[in-house]
């Protein structure tokens, strides 16, 4: 039976390839970061506008001085993002080529697909891959911590933590309170890390 002149076999669903899954996951993570940042800015008094960024399509924000602000362009996009295949148009073309190659060389009815020669990656991917390989290198063994430095750092952190707690108790500004809470959390995390160094 044909639908609009097409075979029913043309409509079989195939799960996304590993590359497509990575692209979708990276886009989802990027959208989550944008949403979190936008929420933070809205709490600081920014207004959400009915317009979107001409470059990336993200909803624009406006501060109290009426300056237009795009969270994605001004905070997330960096040189690292340009090399990220999930966010780069060139990587999308590579993905389309991979899909075409996979569909044009469908395996025969045998249980093992024929081996395919490796497809060379574009140069812009090589730098990102090298960065990943370097990041996965095993860490060097840590030198024993200098107890004087650890103790003086703990003292400074405890003083800063005490000061921030007192300031938070007397703060009437939401923005200041948010910043003080962030400082308290950072001090607590740093103290925890220093305690791990001591043990």
Swiss-Prot record:
It is found in: Cytoplasm. Residues 127-137 have a biased composition (Low complexity). Binds 1 zinc ion per subunit. Might play a role in mitosis. Could be a centromere-associated protein. Antigenic molecule. May induce anti-centromere antibodies. This is Protein ZNRD2. One of its GO terms (cellular component) is cytoplasm. The gene is Znrd2. Its cofactor is Zn(2+). Zn(2+) binds at residues 53, 56, 70, 73.
